[in-house]
Amino acid sequence: MTDRKKLLRSLDGEVQKVPPIWMMRQAGRYLPEYRATRAEAGDFLSLCYNSELAAEVTLQPIRRYGFDAAILFADILLIPDALGADLWFVTGEGPRLSTIETMEEFNKLKPADEVHDHLAPIYETVRILSRELPAETALIGFAGAPWTVATYMIAGRGTPDQAPAHKLMREAPEVFDALMDRLTEATIAYLSMQIEAGAETVKIFDSWAGSLKGEAFTKYALEPTKKIIAALKTKHPDTPIIAFPREAGDGYIGFAKATGADCVALDNSVSAAWAAEHVQVDGCVQGNLASSHMVTGGQALVDETREIVQAFSKGPHIFNLGHGITPDADPENVQLMIDTVRSA
């Protein structure tokens, strides 16, 4: 019997009868204890930068559910904040940022290696969690991928089709490429410090990768992820890395080999059976239950969960949702999912 944590064993390539389980956004508004702590912090950004409270909300779903991993509570837009972009959150609408559309605006950003003072509270959160998590619980750090973060910085907000970023890519490629390079370097620096602070694995979230097609997907989703992973592996060769090019479709095929990722996370737009045949052949996969099941529950949740576990049973697998859990989820449905996975 090994004492290596279940999540890390899957990332090592081990096939486990009962896969490790955690959820994207497992610390979130669906939990009453999270809502209470967020109210104490005052606002979302204050919660991210308050190391003690950020650690507390990270620990809450571990106490309640006993997940096999905790993911650092933070936000993908902390890097632009640290680079000097203005960032604020509008209640009910989400993030707002100062826009980067010209070289003059880009040149106001800080160099990538100057983000650490601003992000010091995040590293302290990681250190607290390293001390306080149960011995069997793995700690996941994370960052947004350069493309996804760039879409917010260019538009100044989330957009349904990422049109402003695509427009800048075509009309001012020198500005777009400079921003992508800056974000790539800042992401390397940020994740490396998370690992040094105690993160046992890190995940790169490319939430809008699916809006890139063909050569653009290769250049702006795959290649930056590859560069980040190569830099991290040079400095931290024993730290496994999870990549999530959400809604990549056929782009999931070969993504692990092309980027050097130890695991590819899958959204629920691809079936588990398809992914087992085309993606899991290269190693560990993570996913991919539709988050809507956390709202509706019932036998459909049980059946789909069992189907996913079975589909991925012949290779290394981490059970997760295909996207983050939503605020309207029922905490009891989360427990039902966990019980189903662990009794599979």
Swiss-Prot record:
Any one cellular-component term (Gene Ontology): cytosol
Localisation per UniProt entry: Cytoplasm
Disulphides: none
Main location: cytoplasm
Catalysed reaction equations from the record: uroporphyrinogen III + 4 H(+) = coproporphyrinogen III + 4 CO2
Alphabetical list of CDD domains matching this protein: URO-D
Signal peptide boundaries: none
EC number(s) given by UniProt: 4.1.1.37
Membrane is among the record's keywords: no
Group of enzyme by EC: lyase
Keyword tags: Cytoplasm, Decarboxylase, Lyase, Porphyrin biosynthesis
GO molecular function: uroporphyrinogen decarboxylase activity
InterPro entries: UROD/MetE-like_sf, Uroporphyrinogen_deCO2ase_HemE, Uroporphyrinogen_deCOase
Database matches in Gene3D superfamilies: 3.20.20.210
Positions annotated to bind substrate: R25, Q26, A27, G28, R29, D75, Y152, S207, H323
Site annotation Transition state stabilizer: residues: D75
Presence of keyword ATP-binding: no
Family the entry assigns: Belongs to the uroporphyrinogen decarboxylase family.
Family matches, as NCBIfam families: hemE
Function: Catalyzes the decarboxylation of four acetate groups of uroporphyrinogen-III to yield coproporphyrinogen-III.
Subunit comment: Homodimer.
PANTHER family: METHYLTETRAHYDROFOLATE:HOMOCYSTEINE METHYLTRANSFERASE RELATED, UROPORPHYRINOGEN DECARBOXYLASE
Name assigned to this protein: Uroporphyrinogen decarboxylase
Organism: Dinoroseobacter shibae (strain DSM 16493 / NCIMB 14021 / DFL 12)
Record lineage: Bacteria, Pseudomonadati, Pseudomonadota, Alphaproteobacteria, Rhodobacterales
Gene name per UniProt: hemE
